[in-house]
């Protein structure tokens, strides 16, 4: 993994906060709750010596040590911690583009591989219409049951999206998937794109 980028502004801000803490040898720990899922959250916390985990990875910085949670480490690839001054004082931001991306390979369970391609390839395209699709279940020897939401629910083009977009992409990427089925109630057209 390449080191997490801590901008100079973020470093100085965090060093200032650490200087106000009681005690010595306090660092910052970065971790992700529920890494590789849509609910992933990237977090920073003070890290006293007794709070370090044996498998944490140390990244030495000018004024303190950044402790990287080992489980979160692959999901923190290309992460950037920055600080920007504003009228309210300032804001610390963490950008971790891989936090919600599942780490999969060809031996991963079928459901994980389906969710991976839904999140990384299919939903970004559907988002342009305010829609998304999620996996509900896998039935009958490899048939994925999907549910559309947002602008896709009730959309008149959903059959074409399902067959020519979603199913085609998933079958190309996952050879052991046999097909897809839509479990969405499309009678609700309140937010439909078409």
UniProtKB/Swiss-Prot annotation:
Involved in iron-sulfur cluster biogenesis. Binds a 4Fe-4S cluster, can transfer this cluster to apoproteins, and thereby intervenes in the maturation of Fe/S proteins. Could also act as a scaffold/chaperone for damaged Fe/S proteins. HAMAP family: Fe_S_biogen_NfuA. Binds 1 [4Fe-4S] cluster per subunit. The cluster is presumably bound at the interface of two monomers. Belongs to the NfuA family. GO terms for biological process: iron-sulfur cluster assembly; protein maturation. This is Fe/S biogenesis protein NfuA. It comes from Azotobacter vinelandii (strain DJ / ATCC BAA-1303). One of its GO terms (molecular function) is 4 iron, 4 sulfur cluster binding. Gene3D superfamilies: Fe-S cluster assembly (FSCA), HesB-like domain.
């Amino acid at each position: 993994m390449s080191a997490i980028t801590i901008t100079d502004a973020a470093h100085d801000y965090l060093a200032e906060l650490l200087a106000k803490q009681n005690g010595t040898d306090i660092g910052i720990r970065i971790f992700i709750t529920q890494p590789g899922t849509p609910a992933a959250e990237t977090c920073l916390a003070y890290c006293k010596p007794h709070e370090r985990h044996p498998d944490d990875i140390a990244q030495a910085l000018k004024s303190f040590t950044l402790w990287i949670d080992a489980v979160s480490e692959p999901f923190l690839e290309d992460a950037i911690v920055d600080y920007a001054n504003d009228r309210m004082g300032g804001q610390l931001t963490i950008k971790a583009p891989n936090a919600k991306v599942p780490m999969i390979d060809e031996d991963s369970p079928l459901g994980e591989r389906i969710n991976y391609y839904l999140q990384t390839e299919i939903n970004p395209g559907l988002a342009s219409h305010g829609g998304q699709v999620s996996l509900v279940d896998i039935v009958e020897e490899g048939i994925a049951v999907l549910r559309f939401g947002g602008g896709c629910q009730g959309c008149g083009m959903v059959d074409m999206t399902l067959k020519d977009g979603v199913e085609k992409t998933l079958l190309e990427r996952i050879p052991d998937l046999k097909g897809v089925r839509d479990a969405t109630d499309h009678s609700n057209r309140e937010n439909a794109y078409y």
